[in-house]
């Protein structure tokens, strides 16, 4: 028997807020489910506007598509634990995914998790090195590196290591950083001060552990 699962709680991240909302909403609506969407606290406006447009179209009955905003502990956790929510779909960190799985056990609701990872990009000596360098750089820097599948762990065979390092360094050094709304910018700011401090911490950690910076590494933390 195939039938709608019921009320679906959908919790989405901040790195692709509009796209993630569209992905989550479309399949649940197509399956005949009602939805409570919880966007990330850093990026709620795109989800609010999208659902406003959909609800104003009068294509859905009132109450089918709903949005709650707020921090995880205030909005996400109650949604995951609510006894009248039949399924939770979450995209985000592994740590939060574990908490959602635990919270969902109260009524044995269905759970689907799309969690982040850091599987490495590996370049072998028989690869098309120019293409591999371009692809690896794109995997590292796409969306400012704010991607759950970002290729920021890169391993290259010793025979091509220096060539790969030089190529990635050259690409990184030539990226134009600027305001996100400036069409000439190739990379805008990170999503929040919290994320900036986290990334800066990774740089400092690498330096303290003997890592060599081959491009960039300087940043302004005055504001």
Predicted regions and their residues:
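ALDH superfamily catalytic-core signature
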Residues: 63, 95-223
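Rossmann-like NAD(P) dinucleotide-binding subdomain of oxidoreductase/dehydrogenase enzymes
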Residues: 1-131
